[in-house]
């Protein structure tokens, strides 16, 4: 039941935040491996990107990739949050005093994140391809021209096999390890602190909401460079064998980005990342916490 509730919670958040994921993806691909000031900026900021995409591609384009995004969230976060919740409910993450151990929470979050992300990697790759697709006048990054999720998965599988479907999976793991461990560690620790300080009534939904807000800030700062690199790894063009033509791996992507675009190139789209990850983290963790509380109350 933990896995089902976790997947449902993540999907609920995804419906609201997917347009921000589209904006974030395009801002991260804009000016790829080009020095600042040498390329046309189709998307100047989050709000301009929303306006531009809606105007040129149509309002429906703001929900591009929603199908694979929902499937990925259900698979990835169902496994990630479900596994973490199982470990938490059995007391593996607590100290002798009954509070969450930051080290154990971070380790459990990282391990759970790796399992979920690796399984869902082909879906995430196709989601990235679909969200990057745009009209030629505002296109950024490589354009794959997929017709949909199933067509894309079938085409990639036929051309490059399982290796092609899981291309970029290993390179995407540092993003998830850092993001998941930061998110779940800060969420659990802040919940403990708020409960100890008795700022809100015991078992109040405000505790989960406040902890999720803090967790959202932490995850964006820690994860954005790896998120930029991961997006580019998944979206890069490939040769006939399915091998990437621009980056050899996550470290190469980070180094090339920093060398060509500067330090802030690794933080491209951080505003969009927070507008997306902030609400997504808040909503998914809040829904997850409330569903678990409801289930535990009902089960008893």
Swiss-Prot record:
Solcar repeats lie at residues 1-90, 100-193, 203-294. The chain crosses the membrane at residues 38-58, 59-79, 91-119, 169-190, 205-225, 277-300. Keywords: Membrane, Mitochondrion, Mitochondrion inner membrane, Repeat, Transmembrane, Transmembrane helix, Transport. InterPro entries: Mito_Carrier_Antiporter, Mitochondrial_sb/sol_carrier, Mt_carrier_dom_sf. The keyword Magnesium does not apply. GO terms for cellular component: mitochondrial inner membrane; mitochondrion. It comes from the Eukaryota. Its main location: mitochondrion. It is a multi-pass membrane protein. It is found in: Mitochondrion inner membrane. Belongs to the mitochondrial carrier (TC 2.A.29) family. Putative antiporter that exchanges dicarboxylates and sulfur oxoanions across the inner membrane of mitochondria. This is Solute carrier family 25 member 35. It comes from Mus musculus (Mouse). The gene is Slc25a35.
